[in-house]
Regions:
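Short secondary-structure capping/junction motifs at helix and strand boundaries
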Residues: 91-96, 114, 126-134
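Catalytic palm subdomain of template-directed nucleic-acid polymerases
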Residues: 103-122, 151
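A short, charged helix-loop
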Residues: 151, 155-173
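Structured, non-catalytic alpha/beta "coupling" segments that mediate domain-domain communication
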Residues: 124, 128-145, 149
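Helix-hairpin-helix
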Residues: 9, 135, 170-187
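Residues that scaffold, gate, or flank divalent-cation-dependent active/transport sites
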Residues: 1-98, 102, 109, 121
Length: 187
């Protein structure tokens, strides 16, 4: 039996929490971070602002950028709510950050129920937190992670098998693989 692995990734997690707290921030470019961008809203990403860049560089790209401090306590509180929901589904989970994780659904759902489960999971997260997440389902963690990035934000993608996955990545740049970034090409 082929494994069913789901990767979930909260969409612009810290920025989305701040927008929930202050709805006037909706549709505005904002980042969470002090010297370094921890999370950028989707509006900020339109200016090529991304995580791990200097806030000063981000402000050069978008002079009207709103910069908010990190509220780790609140982010962890909401992350724990999500974790508790997931642990009601199964304990075969690997939480890799406050905003993402892998869930082994092999013993939880039938293969033909992947799409329905992905939709229901996203809806349940939205009901619980008023936040959106993206989901990828596949046969292993790497392909599930790549799948979760395909239809962001608030989307999902499913690779039914290895053949589908290989076909999808065959014409993509190596950067699609998590962990392969600029530094990789400097080696």
């Amino acid at each position: 039996m082929e494994r069913i692995i789901m990767h979930y990734d909260m969409d612009a997690f810290y920025a989305s929490i701040e927008i929930n707290r202050n709805p006037k921030l909706k549709n505005k470019p904002l980042v969470v971070g002090e010297n370094i961008v921890t999370t950028a809203s989707y509006e900020a990403r339109k200016y090529d602002i991304h995580s791990a860049m200097k806030v000063s560089d981000a402000k050069l790209l978008c002079p009207k950028l709103i910069v908010l401090p990190v509220d780790k306590t609140e982010y962890i509180r909401i992350s724990n709510e999500i974790h508790n929901l997931i642990l009601k589904i199964t304990n075969k989970v690997e939480f890799v950050a406050t905003d993402e994780g892998y869930i082994d659904l092999t013993d939880v759902i039938k293969p033909e129920n992947k799409k329905a489960f992905a939709i229901k999971f996203k809806q349940r997260i939205k009901e619980l937190t008023n936040l959106t997440c993206s989901v990828g389902i596949s046969f292993n963690k790497l392909s599930a992670k790549i799948a979760s990035d395909i239809n962001k934000p608030f989307g999902f993608f499913i690779f039914e098998n290895e053949k589908e996955f290989i076909k999808y990545i065959s014409d993509k740049k190596i950067r699609i693989i998590p962990g392969v970034g600029k530094k990789f090409f400097e080696i």
